[in-house]
Swiss-Prot record:
Subcellular location: Secreted, Extracellular space
Ranges for region Disordered: 86-110, 177-197, 235-255
Annotated tissue distribution: Main cells of the accessory glands of males.
Name of the protein this chain belongs to: Accessory gland-specific peptide 26Aa
GO molecular function, one term: identical protein binding
Signal peptide region: 1-18
Main subcellular location: secreted
Ranges annotated as biased composition (Basic residues): 183-192
Matches recorded under Pfam families: MAGSP
Sugar attachment sites: 88, 95, 136
């Protein structure tokens, strides 16, 4: 790409040099025509400047590096129209408008320069088209590279997801193996409660509970006897004979 841009710059430089050379030759013809002392000796038309064309061909890098069959060497410049690619140069137009009609019609002097200019213009156009093609091709390659990068990123993300899923499966498999390893193991048998002696405080608590339970049952029995005795006295008041016993003792036969 750098070599192509360099060739384009060289072609532009050669185009400018050839244009200046043509203007210089036209100005020289005007000076020779206006000089009255040399008008009888010199001709109106300057000789063909083959040295300039040889110098242009010598300094042209594209012609040196061009191979046989290249598009630069195969151009038929004689068939190209002369009004193609007009030169946008106001100075040359001004000078050409002031030239006499006799100098403007001297085509043998300008033929070689015009052919060289047309060839340079055509070559410049071809280089520009080639640059545009290469630029479009580079853009398409960059787009393809970006698409490949996107595919690579997606593939990496997919690999990461697969690795995470594989780790989860390994974890589940290890848990299942641990559960299978626990199943064959037998649990320790507990000793029967009869063989185990209760602690001292537990025994003391049992004794206290039994004592209070017995006292409660005794009081409940005495209360029942007293109630029965009082009911009997209410039903039979005439037969109430004092026995000398306290009412609280009750009748033992009424249980």
């Amino acid at each position: 790409m750098n070599q192509i841009l360099l060739c384009s710059q060289i072609l532009l430089l050669l185009f400018a040099v050839a244009n200046c050379d043509g203007e210089h030759q036209l100005d020289s013809s005007m000076d020779l025509k206006s000089d009255s002392t040399k008008s009888a000796v010199l001709k109106n038309v300057a000789p063909k400047n083959d040295a300039t064309q040889a110098e242009i061909a010598k300094d042209d890098v594209a012609l040196k590096s061009g191979k046989k069959g290249d598009y630069v060497m195969d151009i038929d410049v004689c068939t190209m129209p002369l009004d193609d690619y007009p030169i946008n140069n106001s100075k040359s137009r001004k000078n050409s408008s002031t030239l006499p009609s006799q100098i403007l019609t001297d085509k043998p002097n300008q033929g070689s320069n015009q052919i060289a200019l047309k060839a340079l213009k055509h070559r410049l156009l071809m280089e520009q088209n080639n640059n545009l093609f290469l630029r479009n091709h580079s853009v398409s390659l960059m787009n393809e590279i970006e698409a490949r990068k996107t595919d690579i990123i997606q593939a990496r993300q997919l690999n990461i997801d697969l690795e995470l899923e594989l780790e989860a499966l390994k974890r589940k498999l290890s848990e299942m193996n641990a559960q299978n390893a626990r199943k064959p193991t037998k649990s320790c048998k507990k000793r029967p409660s009869k063989d185990i002696a209760p602690p001292a405080n537990q025994l003391q608590e049992v004794i206290v509970k039994n004592t209070y339970r017995n006292k409660y049952l005794t009081l409940l029995t005495q209360l029942a006897q007293k109630i029965n005795y009082e009911i009997a006295n209410v039903n039979n008041p005439a037969t109430d004979v004092p026995t000398g016993k306290s009412p609280s003792e009750g009748n033992p036969s009424t249980t």
